[in-house]
Amino acid sequence: ILNKYCKFLPVEIKFGTKTDKIDDPKGKKDDKDNIIKIDKVSDNIINNTKPAWTKKPSNLKDEHYKSFYKELYPMEMSDPLFHIHLNVDFPFNLTGILYFPKLKNNLEVQKNKINLYSNQVFITDNVENIVPDFLTLLHGVIDSPDIPLNVSRSYLQADGNVKKISSHITKKVAGKLSNMFKKDRKDFEQKWEDIKASHKPNCWGRK
């Protein structure tokens, strides 16, 4: 429960203590002239107060995004195909990182992998009424204080900010795909098999 709801809270959460082995600060050595190890007891902080999506995109490298992906999905073996960093403060507030995963055969298990936060407080992993249907296979995090905490379908569909955020996410994904195509068409074509799969109607259970 703590990991799900408090993983990225902006204040540190201490849960007991942890013990690490460190070199003796006084430089004491053993019989083999090696610096001895001593125990260092410190607070066990269980949350990440500064997750990648709260940082400026210019301060992050590709390996940082991949590392955060592994932090979100430690059981995911494959690296994502690409990522999109959301960072908007007008006319609505929206931050986050969305990843396009390497799709598995069973597309259904890939859903509900986008977590919604409000100021780093977890709200829900059901974003079907916030993120367009054809993008719900994306993974990642979106954080916005402008999305109402009442996440009922009818309430979200009527909210103006939600509509703007949904449209913005769609444009960002389209822009990313366009840039990928223009920048490195060969690489884009290699990833296209995974990308186009998410647009098949059967992915959403519709016939």
Segments and roles (model prediction):
Residues I1-K207:
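Conserved GHKL (Bergerat-fold) ATPase module
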